A protein has these predicted regions:
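C-terminal membrane-solvent junction of multi-pass transporters and transport-like membrane proteins
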Residues: 222, 358-369, 407-459, 464-467, ...
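Hydrophobic alpha-helical segments and their helix-loop junctions in multi-pass secondary transporters
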Residues: 196-222, 287-295, 408-424, 487-496
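Membrane-interface loop-to-helix entry segments
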Residues: 173, 178-208, 272-276, 394-407, ...
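Helix-loop-helix junctions that connect adjacent transmembrane segments
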Residues: 193, 200-249, 465, 469
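Extracellular loop-to-transmembrane helix junctions
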Residues: 67-117, 122-126, 142-169, 277-283
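Cytosolic C-terminal regulatory domains/tails of membrane transporters and channels
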Residues: 1-35, 493-503, 507-618
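Loop-to-transmembrane helix boundary motifs in multi-pass membrane proteins
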Residues: 122, 160-167, 260-282, 350-384, ...
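TM-loop-TM module centered on a large, flexible mid-protein loop between adjacent transmembrane helices
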Residues: 121, 275-278, 282-333, 360-387
């Protein structure tokens, strides 16, 4: 039992220290105090831009990648894109209802990780987290690569430089996000709404031309670049459906980012989700319908969007340039959704001890800087490795997010089951929320259950049809990441157990402190270090590793003058090793120390005035 007979003195004060002006503050803005955090939230309009740009921008590549697969059966098979896109819209409707319930059940943030952790356990939670983290990285790579593809459609001369253009865009978004969520929200709102206005205007004008009978078809369509025609099969249709479902990968972003919204958070986030789904569904249906009727052909050299816009506006005039520019920008902005959610999810994992704790630290602008920089770095490596090709990246995409969809919806279905079997005055307190009796639990459980079954089916289709194309990488990577997460968690648990004061006996009073101080020579620094060591104990041993007999003799001579009576131990090292003889000596002293003794190692360090001169002393 620890005695408390001594007075406890705890003093607390707030320091007024602010980081000094630097290149970082010039790029990122003035540092924000922790008290500024409540003011760094956003409303529905900004929230729609920040968290929906990923989903909205997918209309630029979702229909294209779906039609690209159908094109393997010949241009005549492209009409099947219409029933496929209606099936995707139905799936979007199911997901919207499912995630709207999640948002209200988890007002503190209801991503797949939290829902799975609270309702299914740690293994499903880490699986969902690994899948989502992987998907966010791929979101950045795919969105930026698709944005560059739009740019190349308008300016073919940029094709050889597409990889470095993509990497530059990723770094630009990284810097913007390091400035903070509020500033990045305002930055991204204008181009997002600019894209929506132009795209809806284009679709509406296209339908007007269609219904008046003067829409026409694509003039000078690009080559599809397909060497041979395959027979139309169920497997091919399922592959096209799997590619098209990549348009739904951004649906979960709002439920992950609830804490970024102003109060009432759940209401604002829920309404934003509904508006996002309406906009996404409308654009998906409209763009696919018009693309099929103008006989647009999927191609690496020109995107479906480019063909659609130039057909509707009769050429590459002002409206074409505006639409392609807006599409390019929204695809770049889509990567911002991942930059908003990846650091938060990483911080959640780190807070639970499954990722390095450094990811929980907020930078000078109240954002998780470590997560933002890590995301930019890994996504850039992916873009370089896959040469900024959307077609090559797509097979890796979506399987992870549909796995997280499935786990999230399964967790929610289990939550409603628990809620339905509670008494009216009962509640279960979980880390992410509080479960109370809900009279509508059956209805809600069925909605989330349907969502889980639907997304599990899509995930299976994607895994089977895209396995050879690259889905196998994600299938292997996800359990590997989960293994790494649990290894990190095991380390933190062991460390916490070792450091725990629970059941810890009263510390024994130290009766002796032995000080060992290694030195390379006798000079002003050595004398100062010796004076410091002598304040710790009267038992000070200075150790010199001898690799040059002449230098050692000089040190002995100086020690007689400056050693102040303290002992000097010289360890000869015939093979010029330094660390090993020193550690061996420390082990020898440790072996003979008494129970109430401690050993302190004092290591004098030379700190040069200029950082670059460190290279001269290594």
């Amino acid at each position: 039992v620890i005695s408390h007979d001594k007075p406890i003195n705890i003093f607390e004060e707030t320091t007024g220290h602010m980081p000094k002006a630097s290149i970082q503050t010039m790029l990122l803005g003035r540092p924000l105090a922790t008290a500024d955090a409540p003011h760094q939230t956003i409303g529905k309009l900004i929230g729609l831009a920040v968290f929906s740009s990923d989903a909205m921008s997918s209309v630029a590549y979702g229909p294209q990648e779906m039609m690209l697969i159908l094109a393997f059966a010949g241009a005549g098979a492209l009409h099947l894109a219409l029933p496929i896109v209606f099936a995707i819209a139905a799936l979007l409707l199911i997901l919207t209802f499912s995630y709207e319930q999640t948002i209200h059940a988890y007002p503190g943030g209801g991503g797949a990780y939290i829902v799975a952790r609270d309702n299914l356990g740690e293994l499903p939670a880490q699986t969902a987290g690994a899948a989502l983290l992987t998907d966010y990285i791929l979101t950045v790579a795919v969105s930026i690569s698709s944005g560059v593809a739009q740019l190349v459609s308008a300016y073919p001369l940029l094709f050889p430089y597409r990889v470095w253009v993509a990497v530059s865009m990723i770094l630009l978004i990284m810097v913007i996000n390091l400035r903070g969520v509020k500033e990045s929200g305002f930055t991204f709102a204008i181009p997002t709404y600019f894209f929506l206005v132009l795209m809806f205007a284009t679709v509406i004008f296209g339908f007007i031309r269609y219904f008046t009978g003067n829409l026409g078809v694509v003039v000078n369509p690009p080559s599809m670049g397909i060497d041979y025609i395959q027979p139309l099969s169920i497997f091919l249709i399922l592959r096209a459906f799997a590619n098209g479902t990549t348009s739904l990968t951004g649906v979960e972003a709002i439920s992950n980012g609830i804490t970024a919204f102003k109060e009432p958070r759940s209401t604002n986030a829920g309404r934003t989700l509904i508006w996002m789904s309406i906009i996404l569904g409308s654009l998906l249906l409209g763009i696919t319908f018009l693309s099929v009727h103008i006989h647009a052909l999927p191609s690496e050299s020109e995107t479906i969007i480019s063909q659609l816009v130039r057909t509707i506006y009769n050429g590459r005039g002002l409206f074409y340039i505006l639409n392609i520019s807006a599409t390019t920008v929204i695809l770049i902005m889509a990567a911002n959704t991942a930059f908003a959610d990846f650091p938060r999810l990483g911080a959640l994992h780190a807070g639970d001890g499954f990722l390095p704790r450094q990811l929980t630290f907020k930078g000078s602008r109240l954002v998780y800087s470590g997560g933002i920089v890590a995301l930019a770095l890994i996504a850039s490596l992916l873009v370089i490795g896959f040469q900024a090709s959307v077609t090559k990246l797509i097979p890796l995409y979506a399987i992870g997010v549909f796995l997280s969809f499935t786990l999230s919806q399964t967790g929610m279905a289990k939550r409603w089951w628990k809620a339905g079997h509670l008494k009216k005055d009962e509640e279960i307190v979980e880390p992410g929320s509080i479960v109370r009796f809900d009279k509508g639990w059956v209805h809600k459980m069925l909605i989330n259950g349907l969502g889980a079954l639907s997304t599990a089916l899509v995930m299976t289709i994607f895994a089977v049809t895209k396995f050879k194309d690259g889905a196998w990488v994600v299938i292997i990577l996800t359990p590997l990441l989960v293994t790494i997460f649990f290894s990190i968690h095991h380390h933190y648990k062991n460390l916490a157990k070792q450091l725990s004061l629970e059941n810890h006996p009263t510390p024994k009073r130290i009766i002796r402190n032995r000080v060992i101080m290694p030195v390379s020579g006798v000079h002003v620094g050595t004398v100062a270090a010796l004076q410091f060591a002598s304040t710790l104990s009267n038992d000070v041993t200075v150790v010199h590793i001898s690799i040059d007999p002449k230098e050692t003799q000089k040190i002995k001579d100086k020690w007689e003058l400056w050693g102040d009576g303290y002992r000097l131990v010289v360890l000869d090292s015939p093979y010029r090793l330094f660390l090993e003889p020193l550690l061996e000596y420390i082990d020898k002293i440790s072996a003979i120390q008494a129970p109430n003794e401690i050993i302190t190692i004092v290591v004098p360090q030379f700190i040069p005035k200029h950082w670059w001169t460190n290279l001269l002393h290594m």
